[in-house]
Structures are given as C-alpha cells and as structure tokens.
Regions:
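N-terminal capping segment at the start of a domain
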Residues: 4, 9, 14-44, 56, ...
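Structural recognition of the beta-strand scaffold that forms the well-ordered cores
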Residues: 25-28, 68, 84-88, 98-102, ...
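A non-catalytic alpha/beta surface segment that caps or lines the substrate-entry region
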Residues: 35-89
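Alpha-helical metal-binding/catalytic segments enriched in His/Glu/Asp
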Residues: 87, 101, 105-107, 112-168
C-alpha cells in the first residue's frame, strides 16, 4: 500500500498479473537481443516503455519528450547516443515535491568480454528477465495504477527507466546531474531492481 492524501491505498487487488508478465515477456524476448545500450534492441525497449507511458497518460518530463538523451561509451570505447525514459504524473497539492520511482532497463546484450557477463567466452543473448525486465514491469504497472488514481496524489511522481546501468550506472548519474528537478525537491527515490524472484522467501529493502 501507499499513502495518498492522508489515506492508504492498497494495490493488492488492482495489480494486473497478465500485464506484468506481458511486459517481462516482451522486454526479455530474443527480439530485443539483451537490450545492450546503443543497440536496436535497446531502441525497441525505449520505444516500448515510452509508448506505455503515453498510453497510461503520463506527461513527458522535459522538452515535451519522454526521452532524456546522453552520450555513452562502452568499455571498448565505442560511442553511441542513448536515452533514459522519463514520465511524470503531476501532484495535486505539493506538485513541486517529487517522488522518483525507477528501474534500469538495459542488460548485457550478447555477453562476451567487456559486457559484464559471467560467461565471457560465450556470445549468446542474455535476456535479462529478472535483471531487470522485472523492475521495468514493476514501474510500468505502478505508473498505470497511480495514473488511474492521480486525483489522490499529493506530490508529483516521476517514473524513470534508466539506461546503461550495467556498465556503470551512467543513466542514473546523468538523470540526477541533469534533471530539471532541484535535488532538494526529491523527497524519496524508490529503485526496483531484480524483483522477479525471491530467494529464501526474503525481500531486500535498503535505504
């Protein structure tokens, strides 16, 4: 549950399991080739997330776009132009205060050397269902449900799908250093990472 306008709203009955599975299935499909930054698969993931933000009636975060572009160089010094995907639900009372909910959407592509894969001698698609299609599915579902209940929101909520996390949290660094939001106006940040499975029935929460 989450506190909204001095009341508690529970998502337990509203969460759509089929939508969550659909998001994970697409984002971790072979078509997206492991979502390595700067690749066609990464661009497909960006388009998918932005399209869902638009369908859920989120507002573009800056420059009338859901995309926040930045330059990325991988460990082999190959350069590309990549993007975070950002959507906004304006608050009603304290709209100049922000809660940020994020998850990285990139993964390891085909693996191999300099990818971060544990199997550096193998070149095959690393689908990344848990890491981190699961987290992206989480923010998409939260974006959908909170958008439907936007009249209950005191503060504004920013949803961010970060790019280039696996190679050194580049997307989140760029977001925080180039955001239109003053840092002292970010009340809290919730990051969803690898939420697709539980180990020993335990859930780790840190902050």
């Amino acid at each position: 549950s989450i506190s909204l306008n001095n009341s508690s709203y529970s998502f337990n009955d509203d969460l759509n399991e089929s939508d969550i599975k659909r998001h994970i299935k697409y984002l971790s499909s072979d078509e997206l080739e492991g979502r390595f930054p700067g690749t066609k698969g990464s661009e497909l993931a960006i388009d998918y997330i932005a399209s869902n933000f638009k369908n859920y009636k989120l507002a573009p975060f800056q420059d009338n776009s859901f995309l926040q572009f930045f330059d990325f160089s991988n460990l082999e010094d190959e350069k590309s132009r990549v993007a975070n995907v950002i959507g906004l639900i304006p608050g009603n009372k304290n709209k100049d205060e922000f809660i940020v909910i994020g998850a990285h959407f990139d993964h390891l592509g085909y693996g191999g050397a300099h990818s971060g894969s544990l199997e550096i001698g193998s070149k095959e698609i690393h689908n990344g269902a848990d890491d981190n299609a699961s987290g992206v599915a989480g923010i998409l579902e939260l974006a959908h449900k909170l958008s439907l209940n936007r009249n209950l929101l005191n503060r504004s909520i920013v949803f961010v799908a970060f790019n280039a996390e696996e190679q050194g949290i580049f997307g989140s660094k760029y977001f925080i250093n180039n955001s239109q939001i003053p840092k002292d106006k970010i009340i809290t940040m919730i990051n969803l990472d690898m939420i697709g499975r539980l180990r020993n029935l335990s859930l780790n929460v840190s902050g």
